[in-house]
Structure formats: C-alpha cells, structure tokens
C-alpha cells in the first residue's frame, strides 16, 4: 500500500511539472505564430503587361487619368512646358490641349464630376477646368503639389512627403491629413495618385513599385512590383515611373513615366 501511495505521489508531481513547462511553451508558440502572420504585412504583387500604346511625344508626365469616354487626360510638368492634354490611347493623337502659364510647373490631375483639377509644384495653386479645358477656378494650398485623385466626396493630394492631404472637391480647402506607413515606417516621396474602389494607388518618386494605400488609415496594404515593364531605354535619372490610370470596368491600368514614349496596359496579379 505504501509503495502504491508513493508511486501515485510521484506521478502527480511529474504531471504538474510537465504542465508548468508545457503552458509557457504553448504561449510562446502562439506568440510566434501571431508575429509571422502579422495583419500589417502588405501583399507583394506584380504587374502583367498586356499591351502598349503611344504617349504624346516628350511628355514629362505628372498625372494620368481616364476620362468618361475612354480617352486619357495627361498633366505634364517643367517650366514653360506644362500642359493639360486629352489624347487617344489607341493612336496617341492629341484631341485637346491647354498650355499653362510659363510661371507654373504642372503636377497631378484628377476628374471630379464635370471638372478637372490640376496641381502646380511650388506655386501652391490648384487650377480647375471645365470639360472644355476652360479654367473656372483657382485655389491655393500650403506647400508643394505632387499627386491628386478623387475619392468619393473628397480629393486626395500628395506633396512629396509621407502625408496624404484630404481636400474639399469644391473649394480645395484642406479637411485632414493621414500619414502613410509601410509596416509602421513612413513612406516618403509620395507622387502621382490614382483612387480606385476606396483605395489609393501611389507612385513613390524614384521607386519602381506602386503602393496600395487605405486612405483613412494610411496603411500600405500592397506593394506592387513593375519589374515586368522593360525600363532599360529610360536612362535619364528623371525618367522615373510616374502615371497611373485605372481603366474603368476592368481590373487593368495604364502605367507610364516621365519622358516615356509609351503607355503600358497592365493587370495586377
């Protein structure tokens, strides 16, 4: 009887010690699993090139967007060269064109209802046009203007920092700002923007990746590689990827860059 009792005590003691070891091990395993599947880790996607099309010659692309008829609106930069252009992606033919004053360096563009907004780089001036490229309004903002897109009842603007600025689409008054982060770190040099289904797709100056951003939080949810586009002929340091236009009714985009001679029709995969 004594031997059986001692055996029982020894077994219970062993089981208690095993439990004390197992619990923290399980906890550590759970923590490790949570870290490896962090909800803040972005998707890593790429583009598939479907087609190419001509771009108006010598265009220092600052903004690109599809109009209601499938033509493309193009905003270009450089002092004395800045323009607002409507052209056919099928032929490259310029259908409509407006030259900015030589004192203005054109930047990002977007459509809002029947209007077109165009930013300027250092003058802090936003220009609004009607569908015939007649200027109907001019508004001012602080800092530089880089990229612009229309998201539901607001315009979203970049200024070369890690900040998205939420602007009133009628007055261009600033409503709020959001800092863009990739896994907790700020994403600087945000450039051309395209708003699609509540997300913002952004070029980053000097980068060959496109970032998909939640505009309300600033979180980058996808990093999209454009390595499938052959950029070997674009050798000037200024010839960077810059220009994103969603093709309505599809999951496709037109992409281009500064001084590029072609558009690339792509699908994100």
Model-derived segments and spans:
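Signature of short aromatic-glycine-proline-rich micro-motifs recurring in repeat-based ectodomains
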Residues: 61, 190, 236-245
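Bacterial signal peptide processing site
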Residues: 32-34
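Beta-strand-rich domains and repeat architectures in extracellular enzymes and scaffolds
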Residues: 50-83, 98-99, 103-110
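Conserved beta-strand positions in repeat-built beta-propeller and related beta-rich domains
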Residues: 72-78, 111, 116-123, 157-161, ...
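C-terminal motif of bacterial Sec signal peptides marking the signal peptidase cleavage site
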Residues: 28-30
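Surface loop/turn motifs at the tips and blade-to-blade linkers of beta-strand repeat domains
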Residues: 52-57, 98-102, 137-142, 179-185, ...
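Short loop/turn segments that connect beta-strands within beta-propeller blades
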Residues: 88-92, 130-134, 169-172, 214-218, ...
């Amino acid at each position: 009887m004594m031997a059986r009792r001692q055996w029982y005590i020894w077994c219970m003691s062993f089981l208690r010690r095993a439990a004390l070891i197992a619990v923290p091990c399980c906890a550590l395993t759970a923590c490790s699993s949570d870290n490896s599947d962090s909800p803040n880790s972005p998707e890593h996607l790429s583009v598939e090139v479907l087609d190419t099309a001509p771009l108006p010659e010598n265009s220092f692309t600052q903004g690109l967007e599809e109009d209601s008829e499938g033509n493309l609106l193009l905003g270009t930069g450089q002092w004395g060269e800045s323009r607002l252009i409507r052209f056919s992606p099928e032929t490259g033919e310029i259908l409509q064109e407006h030259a900015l004053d030589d004192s203005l360096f054109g930047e990002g563009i977007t459509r809002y209802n029947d209007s077109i907004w165009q930013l300027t780089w250092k003058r802090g001036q936003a220009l609004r046009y009607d569908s015939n490229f007649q200027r109907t309004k001019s508004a001012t903002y602080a800092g530089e203007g880089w990229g612009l897109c229309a998201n539901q009842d607001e315009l979203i603007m970049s200024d070369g920092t890690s900040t998205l600025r939420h602007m009133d689409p009628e007055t261009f008054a600033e409503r709020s700002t959001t800092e863009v982060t990739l896994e907790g770190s700020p994403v600087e040099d945000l450039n051309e923007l395209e708003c699609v289904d509540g997300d913002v797709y952004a070029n980053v100056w000097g980068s060959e990746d496109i970032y998909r951003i939640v505009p309300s939080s600033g979180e980058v949810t996808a990093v999209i590689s454009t390595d499938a586009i052959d950029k070997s002929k674009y050798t000037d340091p200024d010839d960077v990827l810059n220009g994103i236009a969603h093709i309505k009714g599809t999951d496709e985009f037109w992409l281009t860059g500064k001084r590029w001679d072609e558009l690339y029709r792509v699908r994100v995969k």
